[in-house]
């Protein structure tokens, strides 16, 4: 798929599971990994050289990762970390789509506000038999996505009968 611009990467963030208040760190970790991949895309002789479509990036996450991708999209548009203006961000990647699978919501709230997003495709998936995130929390994030431009965007939520938190 890489020859067509598709690369799937799983960023193992399980080490963050024993921490609290870590979702902002998860978002930075994802953005840093995107930067590595895009660097490989530009690196002469790298197997990924010229293979990635840097203009069409989608990010996906499950559970806390499902919340994290919304935070990553938010941070992607910032020049500084919202909790400390002395920490510079230099991301600004062309993230076009977010896929949130059974996400948590509001574990990270910049300046004590829910994460609000603009102008991004958003797919929310949640299982009706989820016993971990039991109340379709992702709908709260879904409601905090707005569109300001005339571009074509898709925002949809699917509540899937028979699916639980980890097996779809």
Regions found by a protein language model. Give the residues of each.
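Short amphipathic alpha-helix adjacent to the substrate-entry channel of hydrolases
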Residues: 1-9
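Active-site loop/turn elements of alpha/beta-hydrolase fold enzymes
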Residues: 6, 13-15, 103, 162
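Extracytoplasmic/secreted cell-surface and envelope-processing proteins
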Residues: 17-20, 68, 106-111, 132-135, ...
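Gly/Ser-rich "nucleophile elbow"/oxyanion-hole loop immediately N-terminal to the catalytic nucleophile
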Residues: 21-64
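Core-facing hydrophobic residues within beta-strands of well-ordered domains
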Residues: 52-54, 95, 154
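Short glycine-enriched nucleophile-adjacent loop
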Residues: 66-78
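A conserved short beta-strand
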Residues: 80-103, 120, 156
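Active-site-adjacent alpha-helix of alpha/beta-hydrolase-fold enzymes
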Residues: 115-168
């Amino acid at each position: 798929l890489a020859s067509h611009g598709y690369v799937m990467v799983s960023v193992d963030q399980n080490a963050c599971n024993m921490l609290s208040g870590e979702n902002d760190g998860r978002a930075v970790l994802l953005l840093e990994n995107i930067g590595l991949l895009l660097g490989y895309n530009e690196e002469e002789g790298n197997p990924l050289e010229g293979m990635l479509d840097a203009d069409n990036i989608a990010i996906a996450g499950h559970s806390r990762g499902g919340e994290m991708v919304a935070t990553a999209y938010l941070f992607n548009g910032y020049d500084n970390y919202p909790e400390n203006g002395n920490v510079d961000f230099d991301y600004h990647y062309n993230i076009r789509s977010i896929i949130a699978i059974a996400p948590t919501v509001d574990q990270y709230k910049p300046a004590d506000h829910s994460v609000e997003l603009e102008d991004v495709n958003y797919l929310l998936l949640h299982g009706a038999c989820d016993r971990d995130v039991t109340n379709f929390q992702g709908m709260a994030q879904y409601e905090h996505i707005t569109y300001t431009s005339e571009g074509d965007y898709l925002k949809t939520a699917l509540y899937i009968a028979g699916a639980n938190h980890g097996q779809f």
